């Protein structure tokens, strides 16, 4: 049958021997103690990020990508029109890299020399896809196929879409949105595994739900086509904060697959606007801010997460 075959020993011999010797491949540690047990990132995988505008989802995603570049030398493909043009994207990355801002009203206003130094390193590790024709558009599948070409050319480990709404979606060819997602998301999973690349997607929720006058932290069902995202997704992360002024961000792990990369649950993290960096608060030493570090190279297998996992659940 075209596009399929019966599995043979030669197809899996090498990978199965490696799995027997090393076990399931863990993700790399992303620098935060608060996140350690809940989420790690490995090269083959997909992560979907959701949250209302100004929830911090893009900032945390970029922070995780920046940390993997800084700690492990990873390279990333970005198609992020939701952030803004290429200058806006670079200004955010430069702020993270240097700890200095382009806003003149702050004492850590960056010099042009630091801009050039930062840009050189960042453009080596972040391959930013720029639209040159205002009429041009790209489908998710076209982007993911392009990411595989970039992996061959530049050695990238991840590719990011921010956001899903900025892609061209040919719903009518598949009988509607739900059927469309059922077509494109399994394709994403397959090429991620085949080509050992991590694919990130930012998806905006639908109209906010309210409870007691407050906006509710979005769940999978708040995503357009939530059932399909839940069925085909691997890792789904939802961010929420009570107000745009708050630096405290609540993070829910709505789905984790495979279990070796994290666990379901909730953690909190904080954002330092002056540095454009996230941090943990160490209450044991007077509420000290702890920014991401590479002290722990990889997340260790989480025995609690494994023990809490329903072993009779094949998914």
Which residue ranges define each predicted feature?
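Hydrophobic/aromatic beta-strand patches that form the interior of the parallel beta-sheet core
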Residues: 47-49, 77-79, 127-129, 200, ...
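The Walker A/P-loop phosphate-binding site
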Residues: 2-99, 298, 312-315
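Cytosolic-facing regulatory segments adjacent to core modules
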Residues: 32, 36, 71-155, 266
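Phosphate-binding/switch loop-helix module in NTP-utilizing enzymes
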Residues: 127-191
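Flexible loop/turn segments at secondary-structure boundaries
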Residues: 56-57, 84-89, 166-170, 207-211, ...
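Structural recognition of the conserved hydrophobic beta-strand(s) that form the central parallel beta-sheet
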Residues: 160-161, 197-204
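Cofactor-binding loop segments of dinucleotide-utilizing enzymes, especially the Rossmann-like FAD-
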Residues: 81, 204, 241
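C-terminal regions of RecA-like/P-loop NTPase motor modules
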Residues: 2-14, 20, 104, 121, ...
